Amino acid sequence: DSTSRWAEALREMSGRLEEMPGEEGYPAYLGSRLAQFYERAGRVISLGSEGREGQLSAIGAVSPPGGDISEPVSQATLRIVKVFWGLDANLAYQRHFPAINWLNSYSNYLDDMEPWFNENVKSDWMQVRQNLMSLLTEEASLNEIVKMVGMDALSPQDRLKMEAARSIREDFLHQNSFDEIDTYTSLPKQYDMMKLVYAFYEEGSKALKDGANIEDIVSMQVRERIGRFKYTKESDIAEEYSSVQEALATEIATLTQDKED
């Protein structure tokens, strides 16, 4: 549903009725009308036969002019909803789909969902997710430095963070909707994908402390296998996951051994 077009129609009707306009010509009751729409969503006990429960999700598309979310419709919507997916034109230009900005988007249901993920997927799901989000946040800060002085000015540890964040973006967040396997990914597979990407960062950090060269770490052959893990069939996930983990450990051990020699 296009919330923006609905709000524009509401503004037009309000003007025709000569009602007192609010910010940017929208009626003063814009927020309450939006709340009535979104509050229809939720979990309900249906009428009729006993014991029937149902759920209704409402997803509204807000299209602010020029992408400026400070305008009234966006602000009124954000005050009501608890989940926000911010589409980013720059990601779309880079052919990164889904073009959802991971820094601007959020969900206020994370704390409520944590017990479910712990019970039905893995007990450390939220911790792994937080680790990846921390790397993406640090990448955004480091990008400002890279724009001014270049990648070569970064320390080896910061370069590793940049490479790990790139792996998160390209190997986990990026999705090919035209690929039969990558179109849908189960939660257990998503967990394994996150673990592999973060394992590269963890093992790489240990290798740096042991004296390994950052160029050797970022050019490891196992990174290609990590990137292609998302195209693994569900039936082959466990075997491929173990194989990639072993390959990563072997290459890291080789790098540190060569340094000692």
Residue positions per predicted region:
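C-terminal amphipathic alpha-helical interaction region
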Residues: G211-D261
